[in-house]
Amino acid sequence: MKAILLLAIFSVLTVAICGVSQNYGNVRYNYTELPNGEYCYIPRRRCVTTEQCCKPYDTVNNFAACGMAWPEDKKRKVNECYICDNELTLCTR
């Protein structure tokens, strides 16, 4: 019983320190409806054009883009939405 409790505490601490995998960075984006009735695509979602990707609230310092990336299965490159920082050229993926 003590081992199970220690394992549970360790798991909670690990998640609290490392965070979760759905963290898109500290860049906030505007989740809006597109003209075709769909909603914009969040970062890491596959896209065809940049217009499909959610735009950041701060458009002066950040921009959204649709670019090539290796998916998790690493079979072939696909287009995914990004939000990038203008000055640092860092993108959340």
Swiss-Prot record:
<keyword id="KW-0960">Knottin</keyword>
<keyword id="KW-0964">Secreted</keyword>
<feature type="disulfide bond">
    <location>
        <begin position="40"/>
        <end position="81"/>
    </location>
</feature>
<keyword id="KW-0528">Neurotoxin</keyword>
<protein>
    <recommendedName>
        <fullName>U8-theraphotoxin-Hs1a</fullName>
    </recommendedName>
</protein>
<feature type="disulfide bond">
    <location>
        <begin position="53"/>
        <end position="66"/>
    </location>
</feature>
<dbReference type="GO" id="GO:0005576">
    <property type="term" value="C:extracellular region"/>
</dbReference>
<dbReference type="GO" id="GO:0099106">
    <property type="term" value="F:ion channel regulator activity"/>
</dbReference>
<keyword id="KW-0732">Signal</keyword>
<feature type="signal peptide">
    <location>
        <begin position="1"/>
        <end position="18"/>
    </location>
</feature>
<dbReference type="Pfam" id="PF17486">
    <property type="entry name" value="Cys_Knot_tox"/>
</dbReference>
<dbReference type="InterPro" id="IPR035311">
    <property type="entry name" value="Cys_Knot_tox"/>
</dbReference>
<comment type="function">
    <text>Probable neurotoxin with ion channel impairing activity.</text>
</comment>
<comment type="similarity">
    <text>Belongs to the neurotoxin 27 (Jztx-72) family. ICK-72 subfamily.</text>
</comment>
<feature type="disulfide bond">
    <location>
        <begin position="40"/>
        <end position="54"/>
    </location>
</feature>
<keyword id="KW-0800">Toxin</keyword>
<dbReference type="GO" id="GO:0090729">
    <property type="term" value="F:toxin activity"/>
</dbReference>
<feature type="disulfide bond">
    <location>
        <begin position="84"/>
        <end position="91"/>
    </location>
</feature>
<keyword id="KW-0872">Ion channel impairing toxin</keyword>
<keyword id="KW-1015">Disulfide bond</keyword>
